Structures are given as C-alpha cells and as structure tokens.
Amino acid sequence: MLALKPVVSGYDPADATASDPARILSALDLPLDDAHLEAISPWRFRAALAPGIAARLEGRALGVDAIAAFVRETFERSSAGVDAGFVEGVGGLLSPIAEDATNVELIRALGLGVILVAGTYLGAIGHALATIDAARLHGIPLAALVVNESEAGVMAPQDVAAELARFRPELRGVPLPRGDAGEAATRERLDPMVEALFAGLPEG
C-alpha cells in the first residue's frame, strides 16, 4: 500500500512525531526519517495556514501542477509492488491546496475517486452533505464515506452513517470508532472497514 500527503501545513520539524506524515509512516511500518518524509510529503510548511499562504511566507512556490506531477511519478515508480494507493489532501474538498488551486483541481488533475471522511461532532452531518453535493457539482466521484468518531463526538459513528444514508442512500458509509486498544485490536477493527471500502470502489 502507498499513502501520500504531498502538502502539510503547521509542520514542526522539532516535533515531527506529532505530524500527519509521521502517522502515515507509522501506519506503513516505515521509519520517520528525512528520506521517507520527503518521499511522502515533500511540501512541509511551518505556518498552520492554507498551504499557498504558508508557502509564500517561506518564499517557496506551490502549484497544483507540481503536486499532481509528484503524485503521478511516485505512483508510477511504485506501481509494481503496490496494491492500493491513497492521497490525502488538506482540509475540506474546497480548501486551497496550492497557490492556484483547491483540492478539487488536484483531484481532477489526477483523475482520482474520493473517500470522504466525516466526523461525529455537532454539525458533521450538514458538513458531509454539503461536501457530497459540492463533489457532485464539480463532477468528482465519491467512492466511499468513512465516519470517523470525533474526540468530542455527539453521536456514535454508525448512527451518523445511518443518518447520512437517509439523505444520500447511494453512498456507502463505513463507521470507524475511536479506540487505543493496541495494534492487533486496531487492525482487527480496521480490516472490515478497509474491505468494505474496497468493495465500494470502482474496478480499474
């Protein structure tokens, strides 16, 4: 499996273990070092701001074409030994990911389907429905929906998934409860979710 998060804001190199790239590397059983960080997240910015703004503060360029090229080249190099690939964006569907583009433009450039991650906080159902409709308006295919239990959630993830299904029954919802019961228990909980996700992904 290959997972990339090309662009990261709010990255503190002095506390890299708390970053999103560190979590991805840990999930892939890869070491947290400069080479692996660069391989999955080449654009890392200190300021916790929209990436285009954070890039300008550091005097760096950040264009959607460069991000898309990085993803394509990485997938091409790794295709022989990879059974699945994931690209994590930043923020929501319409959040800026570069100086000249939102996640929408990157998704279009790559031709990827989207796995939408919703929460269980107050307002999460409305946010998810708005994102679903925005994706439709932009012609972006939603392959699956994960309902990830928020730290201060007000509903169980399975209940949020069921409620979303009342409004958008065509979209698969997979609940993911919180928990820290150790690696074995976590994998046992995640395996059915991953299987359900791939069951809903289009072939090819």
Over which residues does each language-model region extend?
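Short glycine/serine/threonine-rich phosphate/pyrophosphate-binding segments
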Residues: 93-98, 123-129
